[in-house]
Amino acid sequence: MNAPDATPVIALMDRLGSAARSASTAMAAASTAAKNAALLALAREIRAGAARLAAENARDLDVATRAGLAAPMVDRLRLTDKVIALMAEGCEQVAALPDPIGEMTNLRRRPSGITVGQMRVPLGVFGMVYESRPNVTIDAASLAIKSGNAAILRGGSEALHSNTALMALVVRALAEAGLPGDAVQLVPTTDRAAVGRLIAMPQYVDVIIPRGGKGLIERIAAEATVPVIKHLDGNCHVYVDAGADLDLAVRVTDNAKTQKYSPCNAAESLLVHRDVAAAFLPRIGAVFAAKGVEMRCGPRAKALLAAVPGAKLVDATEADWAEEYLAPVISIKLVDSLDEAIARINRYGSHHTDAILTTNHPNAMRFLREVDSASVMVNASTRFADGFEFGLGAEIGISTDKFHARGPVGLEGLTSMKWVVFGQGEVRT
C-alpha cells in the first residue's frame, strides 16, 4: 500500500522551503549595492503605502477587538503613523549599515606558510514565527536582505491583513532591485500545522527565530529540529543602589516601567537598597500611583509606601518575583546589599535586561560582570535594550541564550564565520 500524499500544508511549506533555499544562494552572492537598493525601495514603498497599511491594520484591529484579544496583544498589533514612519526609517538605517558579508578577520600566517582567517557569511534560510507586531515583518525582511539570507515568515493570524499588505511592498522592492522575489516569503495560511512543518525542515531552514508569548516559544523550543534563537520572557530588573542619584533613579525607573508596558524590555521588578529606600520609595511610589501602576511589595517596601496617596499596594507572593506582567504592575523589594541584588536578579530574572542605578563605579562594574543577562545597563532605562537603540538598524529578536547570538539580534546575529585559508602551494608534511 502506498504511503499517503503529503497534506496540503506540508506540501505548501515544502514549496516555500525549496524556493527559499534557492533564493538564499542568490542572496549570498548579491552585491551590497543591490541589497541597499532593495532596502531603499522598501522604505519608499512603505511611505507611499501608508494609507493602505493603516486601512489593512484597521481590519485586523477590528477583528482582534471583537475577538477579545488581550490588551497587550492589541497594542502590539497597532500600526500607528509613528510605527509606519519608523519602519521606513529602519530600512534606511539598515541600508546605511556596513555590509558584514565577506568581512575577513583574524588573518594570521602559520609556520607552515599558510594564512588562516575567518570570513563572515549568511546563515542561509531563517524561519520567523511571531505574534501580533506586524512591524516585525519589515524588521525581518530588511535584515534578511542586508545579511544575504532568505526568510520564511509566519505571522500571527491576528495580523494577517497587515502582514499581507507589508509583504506586497517587500516583493515589489526586491523586484525593483533585481533580487529574487522568494528571498522573503510570508506563509499564506493561518493553519497551525504550518508552524509545525516550518520548525522541522532542516533541509530548507537553518535557524528558527520565534517572537511571541512564552507558550509559543516553549513549544517551538521543544519541537524544533533546527536551532532556535529565542528568549522566553522579560522579567527585567531595576536596582537602585545605595550610591544612586535619586533624581536620576526616579526618572529612569519611571521610564523603564511606564514608557510602554507591553515590550519585553520594560521593567517588571524594582530592587531598592535599604539605605536609600526611605528617601526613594515614596517618590517613585507617587509617580506610580499617579499612573495607576499596581505595586506588589515585600513587607519593608510596603511599609515605606503606605503613606503615598492613591498607591495601589498588594502583598507580593513568591511568584511575583519572577513574573513578566506586561501591564501596569511592578514588584518591589528592599535588599540589604549589592550581593543580594545580584543574587536575586540571577535567581528570579529572565537573563534579558537588568539595570543598576548608582554613582559607585566599582558597584557598577561588579553588576556588569556578575549579572547573567544578555543586556546589562548602568544608569539607563531597560527600554534601551533594542536593536534600533543599539545601532543595529533593526532587530529580529532578542536572545537570552549564550551561544551564537545574545541580546538584540541584528545583522551579525544572522551570520556565521567560516574558516578561509590562503596558500602558495604549501603541502602538509
Swiss-Prot record:
Entry keywords, A to Z: Amino-acid biosynthesis, Cytoplasm, NADP, Oxidoreductase, Proline biosynthesis
Gene Ontology terms: cellular component: cytoplasm
Group of enzyme by EC: oxidoreductase
Localization per record: Cytoplasm
EC numbers for this chain: 1.2.1.41
GO molecular function, a single term: NADP binding
GO process terms (BP): L-proline biosynthetic process
Coiled coil: none
The protein's annotated pathway: Amino-acid biosynthesis; L-proline biosynthesis; L-glutamate 5-semialdehyde from L-glutamate: step 2/2
Task performed by this protein: Catalyzes the NADPH-dependent reduction of L-glutamate 5-phosphate into L-glutamate 5-semialdehyde and phosphate. The product spontaneously undergoes cyclization to form 1-pyrroline-5-carboxylate.
HAMAP family per the UniProt record, alphabetical: ProA
This protein's name: Gamma-glutamyl phosphate reductase
Name of the gene this protein is made from: proA
